[in-house]
Amino acid sequence: MAGVCDMAPNFLSPSEDQALGLALGREVALNCTAWVFSRPQCPQPSVQWLKDGLALGNGSHFSLHEDFWVSANFSEIVSSVLVLNLTNAEDYGTFTCSVWNVSSHSFTLWRAGPAGHVAAVLASLLVLVVLLLVALLYVKCRLNMLLWYQDTYGEVEMNDGKLYDAYVSYSDCPEDRKFVNFILKPQLERRRGYKLFLEDRDLLPRAEPSADLLVNLSRCRRLIVVLSDAFLSRPWCSQSFREGLCRLLELTRRPIFITFEGQRREPIHPALRLLRQHRHLVTLVLWKPGSVTPSSDFWKELQLALPRKVQYRPVEGDPQTRLQDDKDPMLIVRGRAAQGRGMESELDPDPEGDLGVRGPVFGEPPTPLQETRICIGESHGSEMDVSDLGSRNYSARTDFYCLVSEDDV
């Protein structure tokens, strides 16, 4: 029977080693449950707690609760709960329970620092700073990003039969003429490559639009209206602007209205109030005192409202001369190309024909030809290579020479 009583217990809890980080002042309950095989002649099983390999003595900082359950087949379940009050650093350590000198898995208690909010506060501040930077970059770079997207993926409006990029309507007063001809037109045409159609007439008259106005609008991709004080002072702007705007929206898509900062003062003109109410149908661009700078937001917003401009790369070279180091084979004299500037004058073997040398570049007076005596029967094959002229396509080059046949003469 002694062998039956020596059967090792089976620990149900803890099933594995556990490590618990607890702050000072906390209370923790450690549960040790084991299944043992018991007979009447076997000693009563008991649970003993060990701390760091030593038996746990009596103390006021812990308490024990033991329970026993007897089941069939002479088996018994014993449970012990150790409740610890972590009041000082000596209460931490490695705890194990033992039944019949057989130890269970361990509970390792280590001291954790007090729950602090420093990390959470720092993380929140970091997220807030990142959001502020993103918002600042969006405000500062929004127009640049939109321009980049338009230049890269925007719709190309080229083969639509239009002759002009924008129709510009303005008042026939000195201030508006100066603004359009000395600020708006140079910036859009010279710096940004747009083609404008300027006209100082009433664009939104009360009567039906004239045939000339319809034709001119049909030739332009966009419409720009300079809403200056002189433009708004016209009687129809206060009386029938709504009817004119409805008629204008039928003729062109999303017209562009240039307003001025001084017009924002109260009372607001009825036409401006109407345009702000229909902002989803029109484009309003505000001119400020600092908008004259080419890099200001005014020009960026105006360019976003205008069609996309396509930049063409220069052609690498004429296919006819690409294999000749981009030199015209008809202009190769004595094995090297005739340069426009910085080259001594070469004799022309045939001044009356089509094998002449390249003329002087812009602004330079023509170099007088030297009188030479050339016999018709002399051979000049060493001075000019014309062996492959018959196989070339001369119709592709019209800037330097032109070949004619006897029938044309």
Swiss-Prot record:
User: For side Extracellular, which residue ranges?
Assistant: 1-117
Q: In which tissues is it expressed?
A: Expressed at high levels in kidney, and at moderate levels in colon, small intestine, lung, spleen and liver. Not expressed in brain and muscle. Expressed at high levels in epithelial cells, at moderate levels in splenocytes, and at low or undetectable levels in fibroblasts or endothelial cells. Expressed in mucosal and dendritic cells.
The compartments listed are: Membrane
Any Gene Ontology CC annotation? membrane
| CDD domains, sorted | Ig
Show the InterPro entries listed in the entry: Ig-like_dom, Ig-like_dom_sf, Ig-like_fold, IL-1_rcpt_fam, TIR_dom, Toll_tir_struct_dom_sf
Q: Where are the transmembrane segments?
A: 118-138
Glycosylated positions are N31, N58, N73, N85, N101
Q: Which GO terms describe its biological process?
A: acute-phase response; negative regulation of chemokine production; negative regulation of cytokine-mediated signaling pathway; negative regulation of interleukin-1-mediated signaling pathway; negative regulation of Toll signaling pathway; signal transduction
Question: Which parts of the sequence belong to the Ig-like C2-type domain?
Answer: 9-108
Disulfide topology: C32-C97
* Lineage: superkingdom: Eukaryota
Q: Does the keyword Glycoprotein apply?
A: yes
Keyword Transmembrane: yes or no? yes
Q: Which residue positions does Phosphoserine occur at?
A: S382
The induction comment states: Down-regulated by LPS. Down-regulated during inflammation by inhibition of an SP1-mediated pathway.
**Chain ranges of the TIR domain:** 162-306
List, alphabetically, the SMART domains matched.
Answer: TIR
Membrane association type: Single-pass type III membrane protein
Role according to the record? Acts as a negative regulator of the Toll-like and IL-1R receptor signaling pathways. Attenuates the recruitment of receptor-proximal signaling components to the TLR4 receptor, probably through an TIR-TIR domain interaction with TLR4. Through its extracellular domain interferes with the heterodimerization of Il1R1 and IL1RAP.
Q: Which family does it belong to?
A: Belongs to the interleukin-1 receptor family.
- Quaternary structure and interacting proteins, as annotated: Interacts with IL1R1, IRAK1, TLR4, TLR5, TLR9 and TRAF6. Upon IL-1 stimulation found in a complex at least composed of IL1R1, SIGIRR, MYD88, IRAK1 and TRAF6. Upon stimulation with LPC found in a complex at least composed of TLR4, SIG1IR, MYD88, IRAK1 and TRAF6. Interacts with PALM3.
Q: What is this protein called?
A: Single Ig IL-1-related receptor
Q: Which gene encodes it?
A: Sigirr
